[in-house]
C-alpha cells in the first residue's frame, strides 16, 4: 500500500491527497519512480544532485595547468572577470542551495513515509476495533441461555459484565517500517 486513495492516478498531475496540496510538476513522477521505496528515491536524487554539482563545477573551473600557461601568454581575459570574492561567494551559495535542496527532498521523503505509516496504523486500528466490536457482539448477554447450568447454591455471574473475550492478536505486518514504528513507540495492542 502506498497510501494513495485508489481513485486517484498515482504520479499524475492531479494527484493530490486529501488535505495536501498537489505535488509540484517536478516531483509528480516521484511517487511510483522506484516502487514506492523512498530511501531508494532519496539515494537516486542525492546521486543526481551530486553529479549535477560536479558537472557544473567542472564547467566553471579552468582546464588546469594548460589553461594557466596559455592565460599568462594571452594577457587579460577576453570577457569581463568578476572579482574572486564574488566567485567564491556564488560557489558557496550554490553549494548551500544544493545542500538545502537535498535536505528538502530528504524531509519530503521522510514526511511521505510518516504519512504512509500513519495511514497503515489507522487501518490497523480500524481493523482491531472492528474485531473488538465483533467479539463483544458475539459475547453479548442475549447469547446466554436463562439457566447456564448453575446449581441452586451457586450465584449467577453479574449480568452487566460481559464475559472475557478471547485475546485478540495483532496481525503480523510484513512492512519493516511498520515494525520499526511499533518498536519505536512501544505500541502493544
From Swiss-Prot:
Residues in LRR repeats: 86-114
UniProt-listed InterPro entries: LURA1/LRA25
**Among its keywords, does the record have Repeat?**
yes
Pro residues bias (residue ranges):
159-169
Q: Which GO terms describe its biological process?
A: establishment of cell polarity; negative regulation of SMAD protein signal transduction; negative regulation of transforming growth factor beta receptor signaling pathway; positive regulation of cell migration
Q: Where is the composition biased (Low complexity)?
A: 67-83
Q: Which residues form a coiled coil?
A: none
Give the UniProt entry's GO cellular component terms. Answer: cytoplasm; lamellipodium
Write down the superkingdom of origin: Eukaryota
| The keyword Cytoplasm is annotated on this UniProt entry | yes
**Keywords per UniProt:** Cell projection, Cytoplasm, Leucine-rich repeat, Phosphoprotein, Repeat
Q: Name one GO molecular function term.
A: transcription corepressor binding
Please report a single Pfam family linked to this protein: LURAP
Q: Give the family from UniProt.
A: Belongs to the FAM89 family.
Role, per record: Negatively regulates TGF-beta-induced signaling; in cooperation with SKI prevents the translocation of SMAD2 from the nucleus to the cytoplasm in response to TGF-beta. Acts as an adapter that mediates the specific recognition of LIMK1 by CDC42BPA and CDC42BPB in the lamellipodia. LRAP25-mediated CDC42BPA/CDC42BPB targeting to LIMK1 and the lamellipodium results in LIMK1 activation and the subsequent phosphorylation of CFL1 which is important for lamellipodial F-actin regulation.
Assembly state and interactors?
Interacts with SKI. Interacts (via LRR repeat) with CDC42BPA (via AGC-kinase C-terminal domain), CDC42BPB (via AGC-kinase C-terminal domain) and LIMK1 (via LIM zinc-binding domains). Forms a tripartite complex with CDC42BPA, CDC42BPB and LIMK1.
Protein name, entry field: Leucine repeat adapter protein 25
The species is Homo sapiens
Q: Gene behind this chain?
A: FAM89B
